[in-house]
């Protein structure tokens, strides 16, 4: 497709940019790529585009050799090495280039949460025991549909902006970043619970 003198890449429809930023890594769904001469302008989907460009911190991280702190993935033309894959969201197909001698057995998770107990302050979940249970293979779908712009520890930002004026702190830099956070889905969730015991259990591929 063409728009003016620029070219819009159709194979960028489901591509993602992985952006390394100091203490966290963001995943931005690419909306389109406009190529003009030797330059390319990339735009992203919301809500991650709005969050990424409104928050002041953290910023992209360059090293002394000016290596690029980002890369693009999930585009079929980039599938060129064993171990790489491409997910076509429109056709619900997964393309994978296997490594030499690799078995093609697949465990494809469908659930975000395997076990959930939710009580109230007045009536708590009480005295629950899990023994010799393997909790394995869950997924987290939000980044596929809303991108992922975290603050740290995997907690995603729902809104973030620069404080004006900033808050002065003694012996420290000015505090000028304000974020609202959400927590990723968990394989096991307990709310308002007491005396919950996990005995000889394992957690993996979550």
Model-based region annotation:
Residues 1-192, 197-204:
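Extracellular polysaccharide-degrading/modifying enzymes targeting complex plant/algal/animal polysaccharides
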